[in-house]
Amino acid sequence: MNHSEALTEQVFSFASELYAYGVREVVISPGSRSTPLALAFEAHPNIKTWIHPDERSAAFFALGLIKGSEKPVAILCTSGTAAANYTPAIAESQISRLPLVVLTSDRPHELRSVGAPQAINQVNMFSNYVNFQFDLPIADGSEHTIDTINYQMQIASQYLYGPHRGPIHFNLPFREPLTPDLDRVDLLTSVTKTLPHYQKSISVDDIKDILQEKNGLIIVGDMQHQAVDQILTYSTIYDLPILADPLSQLRKEKHPNVITTYDLLYRAGLNLEVDYVIRVGKPVISKKLNQWLKKTDAYQIIVQNNDQIDVFPTPPHISYEISANDFFRSLMEEPLVERKKWLQQWQSLEQQARIEISDYLKHATDEAAYVGSLIQKLTKEDTLFVGNSMPIRDVDNLLFDSEASVYANRGANGIDGVVSTALGMAAHKNVILLIGDLSFYHDMNGLLMAKLNELHINIVLVNNNGGGIFSYLPQKRSATKYFERLFGTPTGLNFEYTALLYDFTFKRFDNLTDFKYAELSKMGSHMYEVITNRDENLHQHQNLYQKLSEIVNVTL
């Protein structure tokens, strides 16, 4: 077998194996060394390829594809520093447990560590962030090489589904010439393999006595695409309030037991006596709720369908590595406990807080008012993708009357890659992106994917000319002299030119009334910039906090 035949067999077999284990989309960043696999993916009849020249943005775009399709997605780049640009998105995928398949092309072994161009040490380069990594052998025509690929892919597949989900990395050295035989596309197969299935049963004997206490809470964080119906069923039968993070996807169910205003209530001084807490999914966004969890004496139970439990903000008394639905289904045989008054107390606080928030939004002109207006525009067909810092916190506080799905990059919580991730989701969903100006600036080049692929998206850009969230931190008061330069960081950018560069329509709003009448479009790429003031935003938010403090004090 000559080199061309060996290369063709290897890369076509590798592409077929990825398909067999569920990969249907690949984001390719062009380069020479990645030629063999790029051609294999492009020639595969059932794999969709996306082309993105920026590796950093491409990797985040792939995360959006994963969130939108609920399937593993691969990214492919050439050798050298191109691969290093994947790092931020890999870190996000590891913490968020997203099945990202990282494929880095490499120089052959004889060109490593000898000063050859575009060659860096790529072996195990993502060790801190991936669940699996392997440096594949060079194509040599040996049947053992193909066996190695198949065996390693089988091992890696366990990290694409179930409780072990997360990123995997294959480093693939290729020797020139780099072009496979495209007349042998018959080697590209579309056979699927049996995927790992995970199901666990549990014993709740250790928590039976705890569950008989009256004052229990269910706290649900980001559930990604996990089923949550049994949480609602259990809550209904056992009269337990659910404190639901906006990323839990529970708020859109509009269930009477779902509490959405808890962040504002705890900020206002809420201090109800709680006997036990069942924490489900990823940690919640709310800083105030996390602070309460850290100091409460309540017995804490964590339920996460992961092999590595996220214990933040404080280790639980007991944890269960099982899906939420399986866990709550296991509790259905437990005796009922009278909790009507406990539940009603939470529901009353929720109702009063919602009334106060709604009244506030009638008169406010700050960023929250714009966010509240945006939420009112959303339908159940919409997906709201939210940037970090202030946007996600305003959504956390204000999202209580919408059927839209809500997503964000809340693994590493970075402000980079948000535009690209949202556009990846836009390939599968009707996406509205809510984002701040600094986060938008970080990832403006991600907009290229909308232009190249005619993706439909509405971007609401909240421009307070800097880092608005820092106004809420002690630095605002203790470092006044240096605050604006080090933390406020105004850029003075005119984003209208950005919209023009990437073929987005553009509208700028400097008053809330005009924005309220703006219509979101289901087709095309559109940017809506809202101009806000950081100091005014801080002042109006503090007024809302004060109003809610009065409610909590009167109620308790």
UniProtKB/Swiss-Prot annotation:
Pathway: Quinol/quinone metabolism; 1,4-dihydroxy-2-naphthoate biosynthesis; 1,4-dihydroxy-2-naphthoate from chorismate: step 2/7; Quinol/quinone metabolism; menaquinone biosynthesis. One of its GO terms (molecular function) is thiamine pyrophosphate binding. It catalyses: isochorismate + 2-oxoglutarate + H(+) = 5-enolpyruvoyl-6-hydroxy-2-succinyl-cyclohex-3-ene-1-carboxylate + CO2. Gene3D superfamilies: 3.40.50.970, TPP-binding domain. GO terms for biological process: menaquinone biosynthetic process. It is an enzyme of class 2 (transferase). Keywords: Magnesium, Manganese, Menaquinone biosynthesis, Metal-binding, Thiamine pyrophosphate, Transferase. InterPro entries: MenaQ_synth_MenD, MenD_middle, THDP-binding, Thiamin_PyroP_enz_TPP-bd_dom, TPP_enzyme_TPP-bd. Its cofactor is Mg(2+); Mn(2+); thiamine diphosphate. Its EC number is 2.2.1.9. Binds 1 thiamine pyrophosphate per subunit. The keyword Transferase applies. CDD domains: TPP_PYR_MenD (cd07037), TPP_SHCHC_synthase (cd02009). It holds the Pfam family TPP_enzyme_M_2. It comes from the Bacteria. Catalyzes the thiamine diphosphate-dependent decarboxylation of 2-oxoglutarate and the subsequent addition of the resulting succinic semialdehyde-thiamine pyrophosphate anion to isochorismate to yield 2-succinyl-5-enolpyruvyl-6-hydroxy-3-cyclohexene-1-carboxylate (SEPHCHC). Homodimer. Belongs to the TPP enzyme family. MenD subfamily. This is 2-succinyl-5-enolpyruvyl-6-hydroxy-3-cyclohexene-1-carboxylate synthase.
